[in-house]
Amino acid sequence: MKKNTLLKVGLCVSLLGTTQFVSTISSVQASQKVEQIVIKNETGTISISQLNKNVWVHTELGYFNGEAVPSNGLVLNTSKGLVLVDSSWDNKLTKELIEMVEKKFQKRVTDVIITHAHADRIGGITALKERGIKAHSTALTAELAKKSGYEEPLGDLQTVTNLKFGNTKVETFYPGKGHTEDNIVVWLPQYQILAGGCLVKSAEAKNLGNVADAYVNEWSTSIENMLKRYRNINLVVPGHGKVGDKGLLLHTLDLLK
């Protein structure tokens, strides 16, 4: 892995003990539909959904305040191994996710990027460390993780950090406070895919969701910073809900009004 830090400031078939079928990604714009492959575990609590040959969305069903909530991250299939954006709700789900993707792609998970210190992102940190997987985060996320009783990720990401995993380029960006004090987003420049995490709401979201640690008055500015930095977005992956396009950022701004 090379690192350069910037800025100081349905048809169903059996596959790998899972279920594969054809589905679609819903966009904010109804005219944009992308056919995809979805692979699920036997219980339906974990799925990976193909965005392109090398980028998949991983989704796990966890529970928040007694309600079942699906949470999204990314799986990057690089020439040097697999990289995840976010772990999962807990160590059990994270362990099963790792085993599932390693079996599917016949590669090891080498690195994970943690986008903030809530359970749906960092809940599997112990499972990562047990496997020797590098867990990248900002220093603030590492600090907040420790305060919440989690093992600490590396704390090696700056305001903007450019990473390279084999042939795959990744940029992490801290646009400012919003869903949490520490939320970052992940940009894949080769594919123009933005993993917005919980800072970005899905098209079907009617409200801002969990705002217990939110900075609602600063959230809009952070979204605007993302729009200024990433002007040519192909797909946006929200922390929860369906994949969309740039319209998800605009929808989030509407919810903040």
Swiss-Prot record:
A Gene Ontology biological process term: antibiotic catabolic process
Q: How is the cofactor bound?
A: Binds 2 Zn(2+) ions per subunit.
- Binding of Zn(2+) 2, residues: 120, 198, 240
Signal peptide residues are 1-30
So which cofactors does this thing need?
A: Zn(2+)
What reaction(s) does this enzyme catalyze? a beta-lactam + H2O = a substituted beta-amino acid
Report the locations given in the UniProt record: Periplasm
* Entry superkingdom: Bacteria
Q: Which GO terms describe its cellular component?
A: periplasmic space
Gene Ontology MF terms in the entry: beta-lactamase activity; zinc ion binding
Describe its function.
Confers resistance to the different beta-lactams antibiotics (penicillin, cephalosporin and carbapenem) via the hydrolysis of the beta-lactam ring.
**Protein's UniProt name:** Metallo-beta-lactamase type 2
Origin organism of this chain?
Bacillus sp. (strain 170)
